[in-house]
Swiss-Prot record:
This is Acetylglutamate kinase. It comes from Sulfurimonas denitrificans (strain ATCC 33889 / DSM 1251) (Thiomicrospira denitrificans (strain ATCC 33889 / DSM 1251)). NCBIfam families: argB. Its EC number is 2.7.2.8. CDD domains: AAK_NAGK-C (cd04250). The lineage of its organism: Bacteria, Pseudomonadati, Campylobacterota, Epsilonproteobacteria, Campylobacterales. The record marks K29, K241 as: Transition state stabilizer. Catalyzes the ATP-dependent phosphorylation of N-acetyl-L-glutamate. Belongs to the acetylglutamate kinase family. ArgB subfamily. GO terms for molecular function: acetylglutamate kinase activity; ATP binding.
Length: 283
């Protein structure tokens, strides 16, 4: 009986948050271990389905760097990085699109649909809903910066009760252009801004933003993030994550969250509990 009472208490604790977020759009950047470990994939699908069933409108943007590297290695195609960004030749771009749009995207869609969701997979090339230009073609090739997002493409899918699953590939301007490889974190931020999302959540392989004693910051403002970047507390791979958060909140998204995707049901813990489990960033 006690266990049943505790279950009800858990549901009651979540109720105010369900009321608050019902009808709101939440963009999720899906990557890291959560995207690669079979058990975590299942938990992710369960979380998305629960969010969907209580009236939240999830939009998923996924990465796939490890899988791209594995395919390039298998095909013996060289791939370099400059300042942490992949140099995307035309040959590499073909593999990037094949892995992101043809393999990973379809796997996520199938996983969600097998759990009873109504997911649909697209890339930024579909309906040219994400346009981009070269970041610096002489250095990074077909690695791009987003110039435009057609929000109505996603809004129309949401209105039809679909869960959009987006591969971070953007269209080029010219006919026959091979497209652009887009950083998935920034792709998620630009999509969140364009569609007026209430929240954006980044699933990572770290607990969130940590101080120099490896303790978690539960909440940070934009000014605090900038100060922590300036003094070196935020460094390395966390810098592009917080930059993507700032991009989103500066564009009107109410809150950005960096959470540990290695924790089962971390999205539900962040959304539906008072304490949360990661770092929340606000203006």
């Amino acid at each position: 009986m006690q266990k049943k009472i505790e279950t009800v208490q858990t549901l009651l604790e979540a109720l105010p948050f369900i009321k608050e977020f019902r009808g709101k759009t939440v963009v999720i950047k899906y990557g890291g271990s959560a995207q690669e470990t079979p058990q975590l994939k299942e938990k992710f699908a369960e979380d998305i389905l629960l969010m969907y069933l209580v009236g939240i409108k999830p939009v998923i943007v996924h990465g796939g760097g490890r899988q791209i590297n594995e395919m390039l290695d298998a095909l013996k195609i060289e791939s370099k990085f400059i300042e942490g960004q992949r140099v995307t030749s035309k040959e590499v771009m073909r593999i990037v699109e094949m892995v992101l749009s043809g393999e990973i995207n379809k796997e996520i869609v199938s996983l969600l649909n097998s759990h009873g969701a109504k997911a649909i997979g697209i890339s930024g090339k579909d309906a040219h809903f994400i346009s981009a230009k070269a970041k610096d073609f002489s250095r990074w090739g077909l690695t791009g910066n987003i110039t435009d997002v057609k929000a109505d493409v996603i809004s129309n899918l949401i209105a039809e009760k679909f869960i959009p699953v987006i591969a971070p590939i953007a269209a080029g301007g010219e006919m026959g252009h091979p497209g652009f490889n887009i950083n998935a974190d920034l792709c998620a931020s630009y999509v969140a801004k364009a569609i007026g999302a209430h929240k954006i959540i980044f699933l990572t392989d770290t607990a969130g933003v940590l101080n120099n004693s490896k303790e978690l910051f539960s909440t940070l403002t934009k000014a605090e993030v900038e100060a922590l970047k300036a003094d070196g507390t935020i460094h390395g791979g966390m810098v592009p994550k917080v930059d993507a958060c700032l991009e989103a909140i500066e564009g009107g998204v109410a809150k950005a969250h960096i959470i540990d995707g290695r924790i089962e049901h971390s999205m539900l813990l962040e959304l539906f509990t008072s304490a949360g489990v990661g770092t929340q960033i606000t203006i």
